[in-house]
């Protein structure tokens, strides 16, 4: 499913796919050659909110962040640039308290902070060249 623009819900106990969500492909990307997908990914990063109710998807090749209601699969997209091939959101990780998602925007050299409750970007942090994976950490000072 590497080149898929969306995701599947999978029942581990019964070993079957229970639902599939196709997320939108911008018009500019509909004729994209398979070899033009970064790391063979349509959408790459995915995170789940702390209450397990909301999913954040990094639409890597589509230039948006998707916020998805886990129960209904209804979603909204947050466009990151006028050119869907420019932003390249790459990874999504939930905050330690589970209320926000951190999404690395590799093509724009920043990390966006998305509030799960509102589905809006609440902060953007400029970072070094081409951020990829995002992790929570703790700095201990003596």
Language model features by range: what are they?
Residues 1-142:
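Predominantly soluble domains enriched in secretory-pathway, periplasmic, or organellar proteins
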């Amino acid at each position: 499913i590497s080149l898929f623009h969306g995701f599947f819900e999978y029942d581990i106990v019964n070993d079957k796919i229970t639902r599939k969500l196709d997320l939108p492909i911008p018009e500019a990307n509909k004729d994209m050659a398979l070899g033009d997908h970064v790391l063979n990914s349509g959408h790459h990063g995915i995170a789940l909110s702390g209450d397990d109710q909301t999913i954040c998807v990094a639409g890597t090749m589509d230039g948006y962040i998707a916020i998805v209601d886990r129960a209904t699969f209804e979603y909204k997209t947050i466009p990151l640039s006028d050119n869907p091939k420019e932003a390249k959101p790459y990874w999504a990780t939930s905050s330690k308290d589970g209320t926000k998602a951190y999404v690395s925007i590799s093509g724009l050299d920043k990390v966006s902070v998305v509030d799960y409750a509102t589905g809006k970007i609440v902060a953007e942090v400029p970072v070094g060249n081409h951020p990829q994976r995002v992790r929570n950490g703790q700095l201990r000072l003596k």
